[in-house]
Amino acid sequence: MAQTNGDMEHSKGWSGHFADFSTAQFRRPRSVCSSDETNGSFFLLQRLPKPNQSNSPPMVNRLKDSRKRRAAVVCRIRDTRDGWFSALVLSSLTSSVIGLFQISVKLPHEPYKIQVMVSSQEQVQDVRQSIVELPGTFQYTCFHLEFNGKRINDFVELSEVEGLKADSEIVLVEDPYTEKEARMHMVRIRDLVGAAGDRSDNLHGLNAGLSLHDAVTAEAAADDVKEHSLSKYDITASPSLETILPRVEAPLPKTVKSISLSAWNPPPYHLRQKGHLLYLQVTTNEGEQFQITSHVSGFYVNKCSNHKFDPLPRTTPKKVSAHSLLTLISKLSPSFNSAFEALQESNNKKDLLTTFPFQNAIPNSPWLVTPPSSNPNSHQADITRSQESYLVSGVDNAETLRDWNEEFQTTRELPRETVQDRVFRERLTSKLFADYNEAAARGAVLVARGEVAPLNPTEDRDAQIFVYNNIFYSFGADGVGTFVSEGGDEAARVAVGKDVLGIKAVNQLDINGLFTPGTVVVDYLGKRIVGQSIVPGIFKQREPGEHQIDYGGVEGKDVVATHPDFVSVFEKMSKALRIKKHPVWDKEGKRHELEGSVETKGLLGTDGRKYVLDLYRVTPLDVTWQEEPGSEDYPHRMSVLRLELVEAYWRSKMSQYVKAEVERRRAAKAQEEAANKEQSSEVTESKEQESEEKAEEALDQERVDISGFQLALNPDVCSGQVPQTEEEKKQWAEDEKEVRDACEFLRSKVIPELIQDLHDGDVGFPMDGQSLSQLLHKRGINIRYLGKLAQLSKEKGSRLEALTTLLVQEMIARAFKHIANRYLRNVPAPFVASCVAHLLNCLLGADVNPNPSAEIDASLREIYPEGDFSFEKVTPETLRAEVEKQVTVRYRYTLEAEWFASLRHLQVLRDIAIKLGLQLGARDYAFTKAQLPAKVPVANGVNGASHDEGKKKKKKGGDSKSPSRAVVEEKPVISIVPDDIVNVVPLVKDASPRSSLAEEALEAGRISLMQNQKQLGQELILESLSLHEQIYGILHPEVAKLYHQLSMLYYQTDEKEAAVELARKAVIVTERTLGVDSADTILAYLNLSLFEHASGNTKAALVYIKHAMDLWKIIYGSNHPDSITTMNNAAVMLQHLKQYSDSRKWFEASLAVCESLFGKQSINTATILFQLAQALALDQDSKGAVGKMRDAYNIFLNQLGPNDRNTKEAETWLEQLTQNAVSIAKHAKDIQARRLRRINMNPRVTTLGTKVQPQVGQTAPEASGAKGAANASMDSRSIDELLKFIEGGDATSSRSKQKKRAAASNPKLRGSKKSSA
């Protein structure tokens, strides 16, 4: 996206996207409001004109004068299909500034007139869309609007409609239908009345986009009187898989039995001439079947039956017709209206975000789903499922065929001068990439399944190419020998993955005049498939002597092409990516100057555009890795540095340059001042001179000119280039040294720093393979360094035992993925489940069955004589050996002898399922003999599949009817059967760029907050939120991140209600886009719990903590380092509820984890001992309180010394507790009685005692919004207050004092550089 800052004036937008089947055109940013409070209202964000302040950044300038006039409002936004929801969005408060006014819309049917709030800058089609979405006007889809008797063009702005002003009346006029409009109308009505049923496709898996938020919230709201949710919670209990499964819900009210196309379609020619479009069949709840004609004038009941064709209007007994199918059905079915209202009410109970349709992102498909056997009736007959392709796309599917490449490039060529231009351009770009990614992934699945005919069927399978839906597909394998010297198929597979990352980086740069093809990489069933938009001219046969490529290496490195038109655009790209301009030599030794790597190619398309291709080498090779012992065994030579590492190296070098420049200036200034001092006799002004020096030095530092700093890396060093002259060799050696320095920077600085940060507890700890990979990539560390990280982690001892476990687990899971992909690549589709199940049994189920055998249908196998069934020969021993070999070769790490005995089976299974795209049926999997049920009849090899005795009985009863029952019972026990592999979903890697405009606003907001301009910073972040929602849509991972950040901002500014609302949205969007059990989802739930507690809703907060802890058990297990903070928060919340006994249990659990990780003499442990001592005092255990406080005091004394604030405070507490211990014991009974009467716990203890949970890789100060983490005191309560409370006294104090002491919270629990293991 464009990096330039533009004016922010007159930009407009709407807070979210709404699906519109009937509008094929992409709409410009909308800004529409409805004033009808009963029907909800739409609020817009209207950007205000920029004040003329030249010294401030443009984004800051724009909001300087407007910030007092902006407010966050809670408004109701609705979607036509899913009801209403409350969302925090922005509203400009002055309609005079934003051009808002109200108009009336006259309707042909009830309610005959509605009021709509509009903006003069929005388009007429946006008004259309708001009409379509209002409950009273659901039925209208085919209409136009008129004003003063004249038709208004849908694509003009309201300001262009002559005479239109406030309180004007426009008229809705129903249009005649076309066949397409009639089809769209039917699809929409089926959605509205809940008759659409489940749509199944090959891209979205089962329960795609699942959210559990509503179910968890329902548990929190179930009974306010009952005991808290943690009362019987067992921290050490085994994880329950039901935590991540959708809850059983009551079926939605049924409005009609079915709406489908009739068997009489399509209309004969002579009836088409009379306006017949479609024939429909509707069966009402009363059991009556009606044949309906879709006519250009509307819909009417005809005289057809299932056996007789007569599409003329029926006269008796029901002569009914209507322009809308919805109205017609309501006339035909007496029960329809009441059922439809009940359906809407049922939908309204859900948070709309949980059912809102995805638009700019692919929903997450959970790895664990409800097994089909648990609900045999889940798949219902619905003839329209097979008709939907026709309804949406027409007879020949031509309506959905798009010229993807032309769309991408024309979108890039859209104007970007004004902010309004940029908003529209980035919205369109985001939507286009989302549509393309989805279409390309669907096609790739068909290619992988062999359902698309190749263009070159005579070639080898890996060399075949395909075109489907105007997308060009090829395999990520070395079918034509391009990568023979680099590692063959392995190198090709890595190259296409790196290519997507390179294209994504170039897309983000948004260089004017440089174009990239739409690119997606899909991993499915062991195959890697590349889908690209078709570049004009890429298949063109060139004249003899002409190269197929215009810039860069042609067919390898032997022939090099150059073209003057590519120099300028490649120069811009290379400068931004830190690529050095350098020479390369062809096979004849001829020198060519290239701006990028010889592997990066430029193609001049027949459309005149300059395309860049093959961006897998935008960074240099990791030379040090390739020269290490064991490099000859590494699968390929495509091990390059990450872009994040190059950027970090550049920043490090620039920092050194700036420091050297400042030192040089200081030295020069010192010499100058020394000379001046000798000449001057005025000593009295030395102090003033000193202060001037400091000020000038600061200015010098600010004014360091970095234009003299140059750092760029040559991506072609150590890759076979042969310099010819001595000068070239010298320059090449210098380039190679710079690359080696970057590699050394990774090894000697970046990797050790990460290990140290995790050791010291300075950053959020990864929870699973996904969060670990994200953390490494963010730091610029390649996955191949997992082995080195594991070695360094091991050296740190028990403190990083959790990290070592995660690293080893990730290496094993990735090794298994490579092995499984190799077997899956050529396995026939019906045997994929057997293959995966057998490999998993060999890895995870060897304790249950040391000799598992693959379940294969012999008769089915016979029809695949060329299929690869080598997976049958795999045994637990051979698989372990292969895993060990893969880990050694790929990560240069040696697994321990009995590594498989210490595997955390559930966590490994989850990691593998996510990496292979598996969806497993949920049941209690048995991976050890101890987990096997005592004596359970085994059905189809399933062991322990049922959750309760009732289900077992049902299954037993059902199985008894099977003729093969006796044979099935004789099967040996295995952990996983083929039926457990319910589905496999494709894994998609895309090149979608992020919105630079939204990020600019966010960055400006962050800078303002860092400069203590809180109000301005908040305004800018709110601005960024609106831009995020406009550009990405509501359901997108980037939007979830921003909801999280914004909720944290509101929490810190004490706007608790807004913080809770945004945190709730963050939870739902994170669940639906990243997964119901992702690490980000856990953090979202933990922060929501914190905000709910701060709002006084502590019972609900504990429900969210319980859910997060349950998720933690599934994805990591127990005793995660970050769980210390969570358990402490839970304990403090329980104190707030006066559940002192339960509170001390959670402090004790937190202490146990802390001692195991940080040791018994660490500051972390002392901090928790301090809190535990207070909890024991509150629970009337004065003796225990004294003991724990003494332990805390001793640790602080040894670690921090006698003069430290923590040591002194612990000493004071210890003295007071000791003095009062005897009297407390004497009056125990009296204390208890008075405690029940007079306790009034200080709210400060709870609100200020809880801590924000940092995200993975995020520092604790970043999470809490603090600038630094100083040694804060351990508790904001005074000793007198606590002792008064223990003795039954009144411990209340003013809230103003509580807030003043907000900074005095507990020291960080997650680690300290001074603590010792």
UniProtKB/Swiss-Prot annotation:
Biased composition regions of type Basic and acidic residues, renumbered to the chain: 669-689
GO function terms (MF aspect): mRNA binding
GO annotation (BP), single: mitochondrion organization
SUPFAM superfamilies hit by this protein: Hypothetical protein c14orf129, hspc210, TPR-like
Region (Disordered) location: 669-700, 939-966, 1252-1273, 1288-1317
Clu domain sequence ranges: 382-626
Intracellular or extracellular location(s): Cytoplasm
Keyword Protein biosynthesis belongs to the record: no
Function (record text): mRNA-binding protein involved in proper cytoplasmic distribution of mitochondria.
Subunit annotation: May associate with the eukaryotic translation initiation factor 3 (eIF-3) complex.
Family: Belongs to the CLU family.
Annotated protein name in UniProt: Clustered mitochondria protein homolog
